Design a protein with these regions (language model features):
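Extended, low-hydrophobicity, Ser/Thr/Pro/Gly-biased non-transmembrane segments
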Residues: 130-255, 259
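Acidic/His/Gly-enriched intrinsically disordered linker/tail segments
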Residues: 392, 396-460, 468, 485, ...
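Solvent-exposed beta-hairpin/edge-strand motifs
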Residues: 68-100
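A surface-exposed beta-strand-loop module
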Residues: 87-163
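Long, His/Glu/Asp-enriched segments that create or flank divalent metal/ion-associated functional microenvironments
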Residues: 523-570
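Juxtacatalytic substrate-recognition/specificity segment
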Residues: 213, 261-374, 378-387, 398
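Amphipathic alpha-helical substructures
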Residues: 410, 451-526
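N-terminal, polar/Ser/Thr-rich
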Residues: 15-53, 171
Length: 570
């Protein structure tokens, strides 16, 4: 028995990944990739006091053919565009570079650490500092209907304020710590990326880095992060130190809750886990099922997933955000999770809308979209601030492909109508104008326009390109694109050029088609402007044969709601 246990232990060590966060096949494939930076962070989180503090060390090697006198970081908790607060939430102190105290400069979220001497090509520097932060608290979690009504009200009565997505926030159940640390900006041949967050769309633009993070938190809290847990060590005062390793990831997120339940499954070398509040068990189990199926399909059609974990975590997101992607972990808004026993009163309109199958399918679509971001954001990087369509339109179309694979082309067409065409048509009905897809996030006038053009028209553009190429060539292009740009940064024309290389005889047609959908304004002719009647018909389409929904009543209730929303408060 002892010999058996010894052999078993040796076998486990033999097959255990040297880099716990990367699959064995990914370790072989990425052996020549050097991380942009090495993060070593120790943080202690006080969930009850809504604060955290710690020490961060970042080692950076200059791999560009130009020197730099400083390192540029972003302190996103101090970005009003993200937190909607003028007050900073995170402070930095005791800054050193290679052990020497140095000068710093902070302007909003931008934080420069000036070096003792210019960092030349191939030279390395290590900077370190202490930090302490306060975690903003949201007033409460809204259900899907309430959130949708808030969004509609903000569209009809614009204030000029952009939404707070809740990426860095907490409510009474969950701490959602996205972008919580001091993050090194991207450094390339043009220098440091100094572009601020536009207040809409994705926040960050980073190269793959390596993280070693030690998180100390009360033992009663479940801690879920990017990367893989190496071990947990008991700490003082009933706390645990969670030691986490994450290789070749562009970001690092932490989620905490005392109320999390977990359900998981293994696919290949990857553990796929769903974390959700106990009261949302039914939805949490559906999330896992969707994540598993999306993972299997995308792995088959796009290429291998490189990480040993994929976590889908319920989080308190707001401002219309259904989910937010991070490497190896995606969050899904609590508003999409249903309580297992719903005993509260709802409005007539909400009761009517809840009978639509479209609302049951929304959670599935969002999970598929967010899982797709592991391929189109985590692995294939892009400048999401400058070219948001590269990952968002592709992830949205990937969710359509998921529906087509599992439910057929008719189901996929319905999702394109619900998730893409409706957004564009609503945008036009409310007076918005058509825009090119190939624009920076900052160029769009609010979240509805951003969603209509980037998520909607952009994804429909990929569907048209697929129809032109045919399935065999299109999916060959996707596989080649994924392999070529894994852990790299894809540009706005890279997928088009890969597609043209797969189908050179069609090069000119693909050029024209890409320009038509991504650079020009043909939304009305390609998608249509729509009407309120058509919009509601699309929402109601697909109800069961014993349909008890009165569409005339639905129309009256919706028009009544619009009148209420558009009437200024007295």
């Amino acid at each position: 028995m002892k010999n058996f246990l010894l052999c078993l232990g040796m076998l486990i060590l033999l097959f255990q990944s040297a880099d716990a966060s990367l699959t064995r096949s990914a370790q072989r494939e990425t052996a020549g990739i050097v991380p942009a930076a090495l993060y070593d962070i120790s943080v202690t989180i006080d969930p009850e006091g809504l604060k955290y503090s710690g020490h961060e060390k970042v080692t950076f090697t200059n791999r560009q053919q130009k020197s730099t006198n400083y390192l540029l970081f972003f302190i996103y908790p101090n970005d009003p565009a993200l937190t909607k607060s003028k007050d900073p939430f995170l402070t930095v102190s005791n800054v050193k570079a290679d052990g020497v105290a140095v000068k710093t400069e902070e302007k909003g979220p931008s934080f420069r650490i000036y070096l003792p001497e210019a960092l030349q090509t191939s030279k390395t520097v290590t900077v370190e500092f202490d930090f302490q932060a306060i975690i903003p608290q949201q007033s409460g979690t809204k259900d899907l209907f309430s959130e949708a009504m808030d969004q509609l009200s903000s569209i009809l009565n614009p204030t000029g304020k952009q939404p707070d997505y809740g990426i860095f926030s907490s409510n009474k159940d969950i701490l959602n710590l996205g972008l919580w640390y001091v993050a090194l900006s991207k450094f390339d041949q043009d220098g440091w990326d100094e572009e601020a967050y536009a207040g809409i769309g994705d926040v960050s633009y980073f190269d793959p880095s390596s993280f070693n993070v030690r998180i100390t938190a009360p033992a009663a809290y479940q801690v879920v992060t990017t990367g893989s847990s190496i071990k947990k060590v008991p700490a003082k005062e009933g706390k645990l130190e969670h030691q986490v390793e994450s290789k070749l990831t562009r970001d690092f997120v932490i989620e905490l809750s005392k109320q999390f339940e977990q359900k998981s499954a293994i696919r290949g070398q990857t553990s796929i886990r769903s974390f959700y509040l106990t009261k949302h068990r039914g939805s949490g189990e559906k999330v896992l099922d969707t994540a598993l199926r999306a993972f299997e399909y995308f792995y088959q059609e796009f290429g291998p997933y490189p990480y040993t974990e994929l976590d889908v975590v319920e989080a308190p997101l707001y401002g219309g955000a259904g989910g937010v992607e991070f490497p190896g972990l995606v969050t899904v808004s609590s508003m999409l999770y249903k309580e297992d026993e719903m005993g509260y009163n709802t409005s007539t309109l909400e009761q009517l809308l809840n009978q639509s199958p479209a609302f049951d399918q929304l959670l599935e679509f969002v999970v598929a979209h967010e899982v797709a971001h592991q391929w189109w954001n985590a692995v294939v990087g892009s400048n999401s601030k400058k070219y948001p369509f590269i990952d968002e339109a592709m992830a949205n179309y990937s969710a359509v492909l998921y529906f087509e694979h599992y439910y057929g082309r008719e189901a996929a067409e319905k999702q394109m109508a619900m998730q893409m065409k409706i957004n564009y048509q609503m945008h036009r009905m409310l007076g918005g104008s058509d825009q090119p897809v190939l624009l920076p996030a900052s160029a769009y006038n609010g979240p509805l326009e951003y969603s209509a053009i980037v998520y909607g028209k952009g994804a429909l553009g990929f569907d048209s390109i697929r129809k032109e190429m045919g399935d065999e060539a299109f999916f060959a292009a996707i596989k080649k694109y994924y392999k070529k740009f894994s852990f790299q940064t894809a540009g706005p024309y890279d997928f088009k050029e890969v597609a043209q290389s797969i189908q050179p005889r069609n090069k000119e047609k693909l050029e024209v088609m890409f320009k038509h959908w991504m650079e020009e304004e043909h939304g009305d002719e390609d998608i249509g402007q729509g009407s309120l009647e058509a919009l509601l018909a699309t929402i109601m389409e697909g109800n069961s044969t014993d349909n008890t929904i009165d569409e005339q009543q639905l129309m009256k209730e919706f028009e009544k709601l619009l009148d209420q929303i558009q009437t200024p408060p007295q």
